[in-house]
Amino acid sequence: MTDSRSIRFDGRPLAIEDVCAIAARDARAELSADPAFRARIRRGSEFLERLLREDGVVYGVTTGYGDSCTVVIPPELVPELPHHLFAYHGVGLGRMLDPAETRAVLAARLQSLAQGVSGVSVELLDQLAAFIEHDVLPQIPAEGSVGASGDLTPLSYVAAALCGERNVPFMIARPSFGRRRSGWRRSVSSASAAGWMRPWNSTLRSPHSAAAT
Protein backbone atom coordinates (compact mmCIF):
# COMPACT_ATOMS: atom_id res chain seq x y z
CA MET A 1 0.00 0.00 0.00
CA THR A 2 1.49 3.30 -1.09
CA ASP A 3 -0.37 5.50 1.38
CA SER A 4 -2.55 5.09 4.42
CA ARG A 5 -5.65 6.96 3.31
CA SER A 6 -8.95 5.31 4.13
CA ILE A 7 -12.13 5.09 2.13
CA ARG A 8 -15.11 4.97 4.44
CA PHE A 9 -18.10 2.76 3.77
CA ASP A 10 -21.10 4.42 5.38
CA GLY A 11 -23.87 4.16 2.81
CA ARG A 12 -22.85 7.21 0.81
CA PRO A 13 -21.96 6.91 -2.91
CA LEU A 14 -18.60 5.41 -3.76
CA ALA A 15 -16.64 6.54 -6.82
CA ILE A 16 -15.14 4.01 -9.22
CA GLU A 17 -11.77 5.59 -8.42
CA ASP A 18 -12.28 4.58 -4.79
CA VAL A 19 -12.90 0.96 -5.76
CA CYS A 20 -9.79 1.01 -7.97
CA ALA A 21 -7.70 2.42 -5.11
CA ILE A 22 -8.86 -0.33 -2.76
CA ALA A 23 -8.28 -2.96 -5.45
CA ALA A 24 -4.69 -1.75 -5.92
CA ARG A 25 -4.19 -1.50 -2.13
CA ASP A 26 -3.55 2.21 -2.48
CA ALA A 27 -6.23 2.83 0.14
CA ARG A 28 -7.85 1.02 3.03
CA ALA A 29 -11.52 0.09 3.16
CA GLU A 30 -12.91 1.36 6.45
CA LEU A 31 -16.39 0.40 7.61
CA SER A 32 -17.96 3.32 9.46
CA ALA A 33 -18.13 3.03 13.24
CA ASP A 34 -20.72 5.80 13.42
CA PRO A 35 -23.55 4.67 15.75
CA ALA A 36 -26.21 6.09 13.43
CA PHE A 37 -24.85 4.10 10.47
CA ARG A 38 -24.68 0.87 12.45
CA ALA A 39 -28.16 1.45 13.84
CA ARG A 40 -29.46 1.78 10.27
CA ILE A 41 -27.90 -1.56 9.33
CA ARG A 42 -29.41 -3.18 12.42
CA ARG A 43 -32.84 -1.78 11.58
CA GLY A 44 -32.68 -3.57 8.24
CA SER A 45 -31.87 -6.86 9.95
CA GLU A 46 -34.56 -6.29 12.57
CA PHE A 47 -37.11 -5.50 9.84
CA LEU A 48 -36.42 -8.85 8.21
CA GLU A 49 -36.73 -10.64 11.54
CA ARG A 50 -40.04 -8.87 12.20
CA LEU A 51 -41.39 -9.94 8.80
CA LEU A 52 -40.45 -13.51 9.58
CA ARG A 53 -42.26 -13.36 12.91
CA GLU A 54 -45.39 -11.69 11.55
CA ASP A 55 -45.70 -13.32 8.13
CA GLY A 56 -43.40 -16.31 8.23
CA VAL A 57 -42.89 -16.33 4.45
CA VAL A 58 -40.13 -14.25 2.86
CA TYR A 59 -38.83 -15.01 -0.63
CA GLY A 60 -35.37 -16.54 -0.57
CA VAL A 61 -35.36 -16.76 3.21
CA THR A 62 -38.17 -19.22 3.89
CA THR A 63 -38.95 -20.14 0.27
CA GLY A 64 -37.13 -21.61 -2.68
CA TYR A 65 -35.68 -19.47 -5.46
CA GLY A 66 -36.89 -18.63 -8.96
CA ASP A 67 -39.62 -21.00 -10.12
CA SER A 68 -39.44 -22.67 -6.70
CA CYS A 69 -40.66 -19.50 -4.98
CA THR A 70 -43.94 -21.23 -4.09
CA VAL A 71 -42.10 -23.94 -2.17
CA VAL A 72 -42.10 -23.07 1.53
CA ILE A 73 -39.07 -24.33 3.42
CA PRO A 74 -39.82 -26.11 6.73
CA PRO A 75 -38.64 -23.95 9.67
CA GLU A 76 -36.11 -26.53 10.80
CA LEU A 77 -34.42 -26.43 7.37
CA VAL A 78 -34.34 -22.64 6.91
CA PRO A 79 -30.84 -22.25 8.45
CA GLU A 80 -29.48 -24.68 5.84
CA LEU A 81 -30.94 -22.82 2.84
CA PRO A 82 -28.13 -20.24 2.38
CA HIS A 83 -25.54 -23.03 2.39
CA HIS A 84 -27.37 -24.88 -0.36
CA LEU A 85 -27.64 -21.66 -2.38
CA PHE A 86 -23.93 -20.86 -2.45
CA ALA A 87 -23.02 -24.52 -2.93
CA TYR A 88 -25.40 -24.74 -5.91
CA HIS A 89 -23.93 -21.67 -7.58
CA GLY A 90 -20.31 -22.52 -6.81
CA VAL A 91 -19.65 -23.95 -10.27
CA GLY A 92 -17.56 -21.22 -11.89
CA LEU A 93 -15.05 -21.91 -14.65
CA GLY A 94 -11.96 -20.37 -16.17
CA ARG A 95 -9.09 -18.54 -14.56
CA MET A 96 -9.30 -17.23 -11.03
CA LEU A 97 -9.79 -13.50 -10.59
CA ASP A 98 -6.51 -11.84 -9.70
CA PRO A 99 -6.09 -10.17 -6.28
CA ALA A 100 -7.02 -6.69 -7.52
CA GLU A 101 -10.17 -7.97 -9.21
CA THR A 102 -11.14 -9.90 -6.09
CA ARG A 103 -10.66 -6.87 -3.85
CA ALA A 104 -12.91 -4.92 -6.23
CA VAL A 105 -15.59 -7.61 -5.90
CA LEU A 106 -15.42 -7.44 -2.11
CA ALA A 107 -15.47 -3.64 -2.08
CA ALA A 108 -18.47 -3.49 -4.42
CA ARG A 109 -20.39 -5.97 -2.29
CA LEU A 110 -19.50 -4.14 0.92
CA GLN A 111 -20.72 -0.89 -0.63
CA SER A 112 -24.00 -2.50 -1.68
CA LEU A 113 -24.69 -4.03 1.72
CA ALA A 114 -23.71 -0.81 3.51
CA GLN A 115 -26.86 0.82 2.11
CA GLY A 116 -28.78 -0.90 4.90
CA VAL A 117 -31.58 -2.32 2.73
CA SER A 118 -30.42 -5.95 2.44
CA GLY A 119 -31.42 -7.19 5.90
CA VAL A 120 -27.89 -8.31 6.79
CA SER A 121 -26.14 -7.99 10.12
CA VAL A 122 -23.49 -5.48 11.12
CA GLU A 123 -21.26 -8.47 11.84
CA LEU A 124 -21.41 -9.56 8.20
CA LEU A 125 -20.25 -6.11 7.09
CA ASP A 126 -17.46 -6.22 9.68
CA GLN A 127 -16.38 -9.60 8.31
CA LEU A 128 -16.31 -8.37 4.72
CA ALA A 129 -14.33 -5.30 5.74
CA ALA A 130 -11.89 -7.54 7.62
CA PHE A 131 -11.42 -9.70 4.51
CA ILE A 132 -10.36 -6.58 2.59
CA GLU A 133 -8.20 -5.21 5.41
CA HIS A 134 -6.28 -8.47 5.90
CA ASP A 135 -6.29 -9.43 2.21
CA VAL A 136 -8.29 -12.62 2.72
CA LEU A 137 -9.26 -13.11 -0.91
CA PRO A 138 -11.68 -15.88 -1.92
CA GLN A 139 -10.65 -17.72 -5.06
CA ILE A 140 -13.34 -16.69 -7.58
CA PRO A 141 -13.53 -18.17 -11.11
CA ALA A 142 -13.91 -15.53 -13.81
CA GLU A 143 -16.60 -17.36 -15.82
CA GLY A 144 -19.99 -18.85 -15.11
CA SER A 145 -22.07 -16.02 -13.64
CA VAL A 146 -25.84 -16.40 -13.96
CA GLY A 147 -28.95 -14.49 -12.96
CA ALA A 148 -30.37 -11.04 -13.66
CA SER A 149 -27.74 -9.40 -11.46
CA GLY A 150 -24.92 -11.34 -13.10
CA ASP A 151 -23.07 -11.91 -9.84
CA LEU A 152 -24.56 -15.05 -8.28
CA THR A 153 -21.66 -17.32 -9.16
CA PRO A 154 -18.81 -15.04 -8.01
CA LEU A 155 -20.68 -14.06 -4.85
CA SER A 156 -21.28 -17.72 -4.02
CA TYR A 157 -17.51 -18.07 -3.58
CA VAL A 158 -17.45 -15.01 -1.31
CA ALA A 159 -20.30 -16.46 0.76
CA ALA A 160 -18.53 -19.81 1.04
CA ALA A 161 -15.36 -18.13 2.30
CA LEU A 162 -17.37 -16.12 4.84
CA CYS A 163 -18.81 -19.40 6.10
CA GLY A 164 -15.35 -20.97 6.44
CA GLU A 165 -15.52 -23.12 3.31
CA ARG A 166 -13.24 -23.39 0.26
CA ASN A 167 -9.63 -22.22 0.19
CA VAL A 168 -8.20 -18.73 0.07
CA PRO A 169 -4.66 -17.48 -0.63
CA PHE A 170 -3.79 -15.84 2.66
CA MET A 171 -0.93 -13.85 4.17
CA ILE A 172 1.06 -15.89 6.67
CA ALA A 173 2.12 -12.70 8.45
CA ARG A 174 0.06 -9.61 9.06
CA PRO A 175 0.31 -7.30 6.02
CA SER A 176 2.87 -4.52 6.26
CA PHE A 177 1.27 -1.60 4.45
CA GLY A 178 3.56 0.46 2.26
CA ARG A 179 5.63 -2.59 1.30
CA ARG A 180 4.91 -5.23 -1.31
CA ARG A 181 6.28 -8.67 -0.60
CA SER A 182 6.11 -11.93 -2.48
CA GLY A 183 6.10 -15.46 -1.17
CA TRP A 184 3.85 -14.72 1.77
CA ARG A 185 0.79 -16.48 0.42
CA ARG A 186 -0.29 -20.06 0.56
CA SER A 187 -3.67 -21.69 0.17
CA VAL A 188 -5.40 -22.23 3.50
CA SER A 189 -8.96 -23.07 4.42
CA SER A 190 -11.29 -20.13 4.87
CA ALA A 191 -11.98 -21.35 8.39
CA SER A 192 -8.27 -21.17 9.22
CA ALA A 193 -8.01 -17.68 7.76
CA ALA A 194 -11.02 -16.46 9.71
CA GLY A 195 -9.59 -17.96 12.89
CA TRP A 196 -6.29 -16.12 12.34
CA MET A 197 -8.12 -12.82 11.81
CA ARG A 198 -10.26 -12.98 14.91
CA PRO A 199 -7.56 -11.89 17.38
CA TRP A 200 -7.02 -8.75 15.28
CA ASN A 201 -10.72 -7.92 15.22
CA SER A 202 -12.57 -8.93 18.36
CA THR A 203 -15.90 -7.76 16.94
CA LEU A 204 -16.14 -10.72 14.56
CA ARG A 205 -18.55 -13.49 15.30
CA SER A 206 -18.05 -16.95 13.85
CA PRO A 207 -18.22 -16.95 10.04
CA HIS A 208 -21.29 -19.21 10.19
CA SER A 209 -23.38 -16.95 12.41
CA ALA A 210 -22.28 -13.81 10.59
CA ALA A 211 -23.25 -15.17 7.19
CA ALA A 212 -26.54 -16.65 8.33
CA THR A 213 -28.08 -13.35 9.47
Roles of regions detected by a PLM:
Residues 1-213:
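Conserved, well-structured ligand/cofactor-binding cores
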